[in-house]
Amino acid sequence: NLNEKQLFLFKKTSELCKKVGLNSTEIALYESDEINAFATGPSKSKSLIAFSTGLLEYMNEDEIEGVIAHEIGHIVSGDMMTMTLLQGLMNTFVMFAARALATVIDNYLDDEDSGFGGLSIWGYWILVWVLEVVFMIFAYMLISWFSRKREYAADIYSSGLVGKDKMISSLESLKKSVNQILPKENKRDSIVFSKISNSKKIYFFQTHPDLDDRINYIKNN
């Protein structure tokens, strides 16, 4: 049997989805203490929004509504498919660029006595691997930058759908949750902590902007 908050979640998600024309979006609830939600699926007509039980227990109805609208924003904008295509494109680019540059370096170092060019066959493939690692770091930075832009856009969409106050309240609640719920030793591996960490050392690899930045962005737009 569903409790009061679970009934609210399913009813409100269905209501907001229908309001924006997402009549076939599925709703799921999964067991986890973490406060988390995500949208997935290949298209608007084949999409799913999943919520953790921890989110329901920690957030009030207004905050939950802000989260629902944020995830709907990702679906309406087609972010899941866009991110999948971008990641595929970046992977292809990394493999091609690494081999192309390794070949250029190999030819540059070429000498007449070497049957493999300037590098041995093992040297060539080790160089390819090193270049792939380097290029992948930059590719992931680009993917993370794009993901952060999509998070800002989903926040604005949510603000337009249910109001700025509810979206801001959701973010403020998420911000408070880490120190209150997660023990210190679990923060490093936490999905939630990875979304809200304010560490400038890893900022360029974060898929989500800092929560303070998101809150200010909503207030100013």
What are the functions of these language-model segments?
Residues 1-34, 40, 92-149, 175-180:
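Hydrophobic or amphipathic, alpha-helical segments that drive membrane association/targeting
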Residues 1-72, 76-81, 182-188:
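Peri-catalytic and regulatory segments of divalent metal-dependent proteins
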Residues 19-46, 115-119, 144-145, 158-221:
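Active-site-proximal gating segments in proteases and membrane effectors
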Residues 50-52, 135-140, 201:
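Bateman (tandem CBS) regulatory domains
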Residues 62-63, 124, 202:
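Alpha-helical hydrophobic/aromatic positions enriched in membrane-embedded helices and signal peptides
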Residues 79-95:
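Basic, amphipathic juxtamembrane/active-site segments
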Residues 84-88, 129, 182-186:
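Residue-level recognition of transmembrane alpha-helices
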Residues 154:
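Phosphate-/nucleic-acid-contacting segments
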